Design a protein with these regions (language model features):
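Mature, function-bearing regions of proteins
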Residues: 1-249
Length: 249
């Protein structure tokens, strides 16, 4: 039986419009893991593992808490606490793993499917800010936000301080294309009616195979360290452009 877990490879683009323009695009890859497949997804892969140290590994404490219960249970509890309804279908996460003992995820997405595994019912977005390393999760009810088949849109107010170069007075417009042969996530930040910032992740699906896993370790030998270095490099560029700095509220 073909696994639902896979690798997504593509590009991440950030575009700041105000108060001054800053734009960049980087190649990226993410793991897309079905939580029911965690026990065997890396079977036979020497450099990849779940629950034990390795070059690349999944470690429970890197993700949504409380971390003393299974991640799948924590996500179902989080959705139920927000909507009063418990998801019963598969849960698949889009994330970075731990590489060479280090993990940092600006955002991980948990896609909660219906019992028949035909559509996404909820998306949990777990965000980690920089440099404080605090976490916050938004729970998005997909059933009420279907724009058209396989497209989901959410608009909501910012509730978590993410970057010192943006204050809290924003609202978000997020657009998701349900994961398939391709995956797309588009996020826009508005202040009143002005578009300040947008980010887009566009990727293509690849099967988890020895060749693909070797390729990503060669092409991105320390993915999460690369993510952090990108964040701080772009922060330096914003500082040079005299973008206002906002203290943590």
């Amino acid at each position: 039986m073909t696994m639902k877990s896979c690798i997504y490879k593509g590009e991440l683009c950030h575009h700041r419009y105000l108060p001054r323009v800053n734009k960049f695009t980087y190649p990226v890859y993410f793991m897309f893991l079905d939580l029911e497949e965690l026990g065997h997804v890396f079977d036979g892969r020497w450099l990849w593992s779940v629950g034990r140290a390795n070059v690349a590994n999944f470690k429970r404490s890197d993700y949504l808490g409380p971390t003393d219960i299974p991640l799948e249970q924590a996500i179902r509890d989080r959705v139920e606490g927000e909507f009063g309804e418990r998801p019963t279908g598969p849960i698949r996460m889009l994330t970075h793993l731990r590489y060479y003992g280090h993990c940092f995820n600006p955002v991980s997405f948990y896609y909660c499917y219906d019992a028949a595994d035909t559509m996404v019912e909820y998306i949990v977005a777990e965000i980690t800010n920089t440099p404080w390393r605090e976490r916050h999760s938004y729970v998005l009810g997909a059933k009420l936000n279907q724009e058209e088949k396989k497209r989901l849109r959410f608009q909501f107010s910012k509730k978590f301080h993410v970057s010192p170069f943006m204050d809290m007075d924003f609202w978000y417009d997020w657009l998701f294309k349900e994961p398939g042969e391709s995956l797309r996530i588009h996020m826009t930040n508005f202040k009143e009616d002005k578009k300040f910032f947008e980010a887009e992740l566009t990727m293509q699906r690849r099967e988890i195979s020895g060749a693909e896993l070797a390729w990503v370790l060669i092409r991105f030998p320390a993915m999460t360290l690369k993510v952090l270095s990108m964040i701080y490099w772009q922060a330096f560029r914003l500082w040079l452009k005299k973008i206002p700095y906002y203290e943590h509220p």
